[in-house]
Regions:
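RNA/tRNA-interacting regions in translation and RNA-turnover enzymes
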Residues: 1-215
Length: 215
């Protein structure tokens, strides 16, 4: 969650448990595409996702000699990167931020439209998640389009969200114990691939354990 005041990045907080997160403002200032200053001068609060591209993940992991110390996936690497105590390390990880929800922007008329909120954020210099405006007739086509595109996406994505554009109507629906009723989330099916085990090598970890490594 990013908060801006007087056009400057004021605070950045992780999602945490949904109620309490960690303040990571110094680290957020090193994110590749987070604007430190924006045109809007009121208080702006937005939510987004921090990610590391697959290409940067492979490069960073390749520089770690200890096999056991390597990260399993870009999400694990990103999670550790945004919570680093040393902001210089965060900067080296090339973390990107994609906005997916505007929480507050006082005095701005969004014409009761979520899409207008996305357009506003883009004008402030933020990269937003990729989206398509759909109707009941075009929804399945759009889902299929994203499903095909996701295989070559440069950053991790675990699903797709259908969100009502009408802000007032969406908020009037309320929420369940865990989720708002104005949106539906889909998860992509797990990727599957067939592999061949050619041989097994043994590798010593930094703690002295001997571990098998599949080749």
């Amino acid at each position: 969650v990013l908060t801006y005041r007087d056009g400057k990045l004021f605070k950045a907080v992780t999602r945490g448990n949904g109620e309490v997160g960690e303040v990571i403002t110094p680290n957020a200032k090193t994110f590749v595409n987070v604007p430190l200053q924006i045109p809007y001068q009121g208080e702006l609060i937005l939510r987004g996702e921090a990610v590391i591209t697959y290409a940067d993940f492979e490069k960073i992991n390749g520089e770690i000699e200890d096999v056991d110390a390597r990260y399993k996936n870009p999400r694990n690497l990103c999670s550790g990167s945004v919570r680093q105590l040393n902001s210089q390390i965060t900067a080296q990880r090339k973390v990107h931020f994609f906005a997916f929800a505007l929480v507050r922007a006082e005095g701005v008329d969004f014409k009761n439209s979520r899409e207008e909120q996305f357009i506003f954020l883009q004008k402030q210099g933020f990269e937003t998640v990729e989206y398509k405006a759909v109707t009941a007739d075009t929804m399945q086509e759009a889902v299929a389009w994203f499903e095909e595109k996701i295989t070559d996406y440069p950053v991790p994505s675990d699903g797709l969200v259908l969100l009502l554009d009408d802000i007032a109507y969406g908020e009037s629906l309320g929420r369940t114990a865990k989720f708002p009723r104005n949106a539906i989330a889909f998860k992509w099916a797990d990727e599957q691939a067939e592999t061949t085990l050619r041989e097994v090598e043994w590798s010593a970890s930094r703690t002295g354990l001997i571990n098998p490594v599949a080749i």
